[in-house]
Design a protein with these regions (language model features):
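The beta1-alpha1 cofactor-binding region of Rossmann-like NAD(H)/NADP(H)-dependent oxidoreductases
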Residues: 47, 67-79, 110
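Conserved glycine-rich Rossmann-like NAD(P)H-binding loop of the short-chain dehydrogenase/reductase
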Residues: 30-51
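Substrate-binding pocket helix/loop in short-chain dehydrogenase/reductase
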Residues: 104-105, 109-114
Length: 146
């Protein structure tokens, strides 16, 4: 299946697997919304929404970098609406954003757990739910949860 002209909304697409999916889709000529929190370079982690957008466009796609923290409903709604307005809809929702803890259960405090749950469970649900009205209008819609 070609992704030419299809629009992907990808959470957490500024680096890693999300960026790899975005660049691969761009090679087919896809439109990609890069919805992530990283707008400024991080000293330990590569990539921002803007560097990701540049990579997507170099690969042949169209990019829309959007600052978005998926824990917040108003940010997700604005990002999804902005994507649909720019590209005429959304065909694929990729839930890639995540938070992890490399500590054991007894060493993971509740603040860290709440962050992980807020992004990994609630944020994934929120992004999917917000994209669904647009996905229902697409010819062959998909939701990918990573």
């Amino acid at each position: 299946m070609s992704l030419k002209g299809k629009t992907l909304f990808i959470s957490g697409a500024s680096r890693g697997i999300g960026l790899a999916i975005a660049v691969r889709a761009a090679r087919d000529g896809a439109n990609v919304a890069v919805a992530a929190k990283t707008a400024e370079p991080h000293p330990k982690l590569p990539g921002t929404i803007y560097t990701a957008a540049e990579e997507i466009e170099r690969a042949g796609g169209k990019a829309l970098p959007i600052i978005c923290d998926i824990r917040f409903e108003e940010q997700v709604q604005a990002a999804v609406d902005q994507t649909a307005a720019k590209f005429g809809g959304i065909d694929i929702c990729v839930n890639n954003a995540s938070a992890i803890s490399l500590t054991g259960t007894l060493q993971t405090d509740m603040k860290r757990y709440d962050l992980m749950n807020g992004i990994n469970a609630r944020g994934t649900y929120l992004v999917s739910r917000t994209c669904i009205p647009y996905l229902k209008k697409a010819a062959n819609p998909h939701v990918l949860n990573l």
